[in-house]
Amino acid sequence: MQFLQEKVKLIKKEDPVMLKSPEDFPVYWFETSDSVSHRYQFQSDGHLSMKVVDDARPVPQKMVESFLNKFFPSGYPYSVNEGYLRYTQFRALQHFSSAALSVLSTQSLLFAAGLRPTPAQATVVSWILKDGMQHVGKLICSNLGARMDSEPKRWRILADVLYDLGTGLELVSPLCPHLFLEMAGLGNFAKGMATVAARATRLPIYSSFAKEGNLSDIFAKGEAISTLFNVAGIGAGIQLASTICSSMEGKLVVGSILSVVHVYSVVEQMRGVPINTLNPQRTALIVANFLKTGKVPSPPDLRFQEDLMFPERPIQDAGNVKVGRALHKAVKPSEVQRLKQVFVEEKFLLSHGKSWTDMVLEHDATGEDALRGWLVAAYVKSMTKIYNDPDDIILQDAYDKMNDVFNPFLSQVQAKGWYTDRFLDGTGTRFAW
C-alpha cells in the first residue's frame, strides 16, 4: 500500500505533457480528381486556399475544362436539368448570327442615311431611331407580360422573328432612301418589341434548368456565352461587310441566310427547354398522355411534343378544351345554375360545344383545378363516342371517374416535377361568385 502511494506521488510530481493546440498544426489535405491533384489548406484567418500540386491532364482536356468552368454552371452537367447543352449550343449560334446580321444592317442604315460611320453621326442616328421608335415598341410589348408567362417559348421565337424583321427593314433601306426614316423607324419599333419579349422570357427559360437552386449561376454563365458569341458574330459581320457584303446583292443573300440560321437556332433552343409550369397546352398534353398510357410525362419528355407556333390549338385526345373565354360568352345563362350544381365544390365550369369544350376558371384556381377540369372534359369526350346517354348523365359519370383517379394521377404529376400551385393561362378571363 505504501509502495502505491509513493508511486502516485511520483506521477504527480512529473511535469505534465504540453500538447500543441489545433491552431499550431496546419490543417490541409490533398484531393485528386480526373488526374488533377489539389492541396487544400486553412489559413490563419480561416480562409481556405487551394493549390494545384499535379496536373496530368493533356492540354486539350485542360482547355475544354477551362471553357466549361467559365461558361457553364458549376457542377455541370449534374447541376442542370436535361436539355441545357442543346439550348446552349443553339443559343450560341443564335447570338453569332444575330450579331453578324446586326453589323450588316447598321452599315446599310448609315449608307441609306447618307452618313459616314463616324462616332458622332452614329450617335445621332442611334438617339433618333433607337431611343425614339424602339421605346414605343417596348411600351406596347410590355402590356403582354401575362401571355409571355404562359407561353415563354412561343414569345421567345416571336421576339427573334420581330428582330429579324426589323433588321431586314434596315438592311433594304438603301434601296429606297426617300423612305429611310419610315423604314428605319419601323425596324427599330420591331426591335423594341423584340427586346422586351426576349428579356421577359429569359427568366422562366433559365429557371427551367435550375436543379440545385443555382439560378443565378445559370443566368450568369448563359449571359457569358451570349457575350462571347456576340463578339465573335460582330467580328464575322465586319469581315463580311468588307468582302462579300460590300454590294447590296451580297447583303441581301448573306442577310437572308443569317436570318434563317438565326430563327432556326432559336426554335431548336426552345425545343430543348423543359419548362415545368402548367399552361393550357402542357396541361392538355399531360392529360392526353395519361389517358393513353396511364403514365405522366416529365417536363423533359414533354418538351418535344409542344407546338411552339400554335400552342392554343385544342388537343382532341384531351377533350378539345379551350381556356380563357368570359363566362357570359362560354356558358349559356340557363346552364350556369345546372353546372354549378354538378361542380359544386370545384373552381371551374365546363361548357361542351360541337367543336370544343370551354373551361372557365375561378380567379383563385390553381394547376390542380385545371387538371381536374381537363380530366372531366377528356372523359366526357371519350364517353360521348361510346354511349348514347343524356349529356347530364355523361357529365356526372365523367366527374365521378375523375374523382376516382385524380389522387394517384396528381401524385404522378408532382413526382415528375410539375409545378401545380399555379396555372398560367395568359390573359384568360376568370370569374368569381
From Swiss-Prot:
Q: In which tissues is it expressed?
A: Expressed throughout the plant, with a higher expression near the root apical meristem, in the cortex region of the root elongation zone, in lateral roots and emerging lateral roots. Not detected in extreme root apical meristem or root cap.
- Keywords of this entry: Plastid
Q: Where is this gene product found?
A: Plastid
Query: By its UniProt entry, which Pfam families does this protein fall under?
Result: UVB_sens_C, UVB_sens_prot
A Gene Ontology BP annotation from the UniProt entry: auxin polar transport
Question: Could you tell me the superkingdom of the organism this chain comes from?
Answer: Eukaryota
Q: Which GO terms describe its cellular component?
A: chloroplast envelope; plastid
User: Which phenotype arises from disrupting this gene?
Assistant: No visible phenotype under normal growth conditions. Extremely stunted growth, failure to develop true postembryonic leaves and arrested primary root elongation, when grown in vitro.
Q: Which PANTHER family match?
A: PROTEIN ROOT UVB SENSITIVE 2, CHLOROPLASTIC, RUS1 FAMILY PROTEIN C16ORF58
The record's subunit annotation is: Interacts (via the DUF647 domain) with RUS1 (via the DUF647 domain).
Per the entry, what this protein does is: Involved in a root UV-B sensing pathway and in the protection against the hypersensitivity to very low-fluence-rate (VLF) UV-B. RSU1 and RUS2 are probably both negative modulators of the same UV-B perception pathway, which when overstimulated in the roots causes a block to postgermination development. Required for polar auxin transport and to maintain the normal levels of PIN proteins in the root.
Q: Could you say which protein family the record assigns here?
A: Belongs to the RUS1 family.
The further comment given in this record reads: Several mutations in ASP2 (AC P46645), but not all, and any of the non-phosphorylated B6 vitamers can suppress the rus phenotype.
Listed name of the protein = Protein root UVB sensitive 2, chloroplastic
Question: What is the originating organism of this protein?
Answer: Arabidopsis thaliana
Q: What's the encoding gene here?
A: RUS2
